[in-house]
Amino acid sequence: VRPGDPVSVGQDIARRGDCGVAIHASVSGRVTAIQDRPHPWGGSSPAILIENDGQNTPCPQRPQPVEAQNVELPLLLERVQAAGIVGMRGEAAPTWEKLARAAGRVDTLIVNAAECEPYVTADYRLLLERSEKILLGASVVARCLGAQRAVIVTEGDKLRAVESLERRLLRRGHSVQLCTVRTRYPLGAEKQIIQTVTGREVPPGGSALDASCVVLNVATLYAVQDALFRGRPLFHRAVTV
């Protein structure tokens, strides 16, 4: 896009140069400038300034939703990259690259919903309010990667979310498993959660792949299923206020 261009909600307006991940407009309106702005991680970064028109006009070129049984690995990677999905636990690494590296190399998909920090409840609300979609997303991603099992991990004191997931697992006969952990920091960290779920240790300097696992934050997984089954790119998320 260029200054003066109109944009709509969900429109692809830029690409991250290092990985090709798409960046989408979160409002509709008009581009007023493209300039460097302060970045939360320090320094500055190129930014697209959009004057919000308040109309929330949706992008007409939204990808068509797909059926779960029709999702294979190439389509999964294509949709995740086009939707601009990155790790939502803080690292912001391209999710399509993470999935591509894991394909055929893992036996376990771990969906990390363990929020060990005080007062943080965004992942808990996702489990409670979107449990069916999270279960579907986990089963589809695990199948595409060739993983034999998918495990959702949350704290044992999240009783309502645990009960909601257990009801759906029993009713639908999902292949997805549920694992509860103690509410103790840093059990939500990747290496600790892998050891808790599988008993395997990630070697020093290694990654989850060395333990035949791939770990996705539950918000990241929810964004993946949104991209597949609603054609919705990543420009929003649940946060704790």
Regions found by a protein language model. Give the residues of each.
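Gly-rich Lys/Arg/Thr-decorated short loops/hinges at beta-loop-alpha junctions or inter-strand turns
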Residues: 58-60, 109-123
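Hydrophobic alpha-helical positions that pack around
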Residues: 148-241
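Histidine-anchored nucleotide/phosphate-binding helix
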Residues: 128-145
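Acidic low-complexity segments
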Residues: 39-93, 103, 159-160, 172
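Residue-level recognition of conserved beta-strand edge/terminus positions
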Residues: 15-16, 34, 51, 112
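Small beta-strand-rich domains/subdomains or short beta-sheet motifs embedded
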Residues: 5-6, 22-26
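Conserved hydrophobic positions within beta-strands
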Residues: 29-31
